[in-house]
A protein has these predicted regions:
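Bacterial Sec-dependent N-terminal signal peptides
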Residues: 1-26
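Metal-dependent phosphoester/phosphodiester hydrolase catalytic core
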Residues: 17-248
């Protein structure tokens, strides 16, 4: 029986030796008593030393998923953005951590380029290529040639499969509705606007329907379940939240 898991906001772990292919990755566990581990995390300010990499690595993850805000770099200066990613990527503990791991990821607003930004951010295509460079995405990968950083990888472990579906909640996201009082945003009218955009929705539906994995993990950089805080969330697009629930 297929199982779908939705990873909402951000924070996680990952593990193991991998052999890279575009969409299918075979993982060999060190021994039969070691669990296959996926780790994920987000909100990692590049100017503050991250002391957690060794602790995460001690869980022997085979896969690490960046969940967004991988750097804090609200800017329209792409050199500044590149430099901040370089600071992050050249951290000695991070370099040790990513050795022999599969690295996946998406962005959120502060690494996309502007606070709470969506489709209107004018440097989104340039920012996309910089993120893909940071993740080590091959230059001939399809993610390089299409709009948005959404991606999928299927991990094969002892003849079992885990499909990881990483969404992009920035590139196509239309306008939000301003909230009242101490709430920054409120839900759009039902049916108004989109979070993922038509192309990404079609891709997501196809990836889920065609999956033969035992587990399907969906990664979103913004919260899915929480809808009371008045900040960014799937709940600001109630029709798309409902659509994803039905799809799962």
């Amino acid at each position: 029986m297929k199982k779908e898991l939705l990873f909402f906001s951000l924070i996680a772990l990952i593990s193991c030796k991998t052999h890279y292919k575009q969409d299918l990755i075979a993982v060999e566990k060190p021994n039969k008593n070691v669990l296959f581990t996926i780790a994920f995390g987000s909100c990692d300010n590049q100017i503050i030393k991250n002391e957690l990499w060794p602790a995460i690595d001690s869980n022997h993850p085979s896969v690490w998923i960046w969940g967004g805000d991988n750097v804090y770099s609200d800017t329209e200066d792409m050199e500044f953005l590149k430099n901040n990613y370089t600071i992050q990527k050249e951290d000695s503990d991070y370099l040790t951590f990513i050795n022999n791991k599969t690295i996946l990821g998406t962005w959120d607003d502060h690494d996309y380029g502007a606070n709470d930004a969506g489709e209107e951010y004018r440097f989104k295509r340039e920012s996309q290529q910089i993120l893909l460079n940071f993740l080590g995405t091959p230059m001939n990968a399809k993610e390089r040639k299409r709009d948005g950083v959404y991606t999928t990888k299927t991990i094969v472990v002892n003849k079992n499969k885990v499909k990881i579906i990483v969404l992009d909640t920035r590139f196509f996201r239309t306008a939000l509705t301003k909230g009242i009082g101490n709430k920054r945003f409120k839900p759009n009218e039902y049916g108004e606007g989109t979070l993922l955009g038509n192309e990404q929705w079609q891709w997501l539906e196809s990836e889920l329907k065609s999956s033969d994995a035992q587990f399907n993990i969906i990664v979103s950089s913004i919260q899915f379940l929480s809808n009371k805080h008045g900040f960014e969330a799937w709940a600001n697009f109630p029709h798309e939240m409902e659509k994803l629930e039905k799809l799962i």
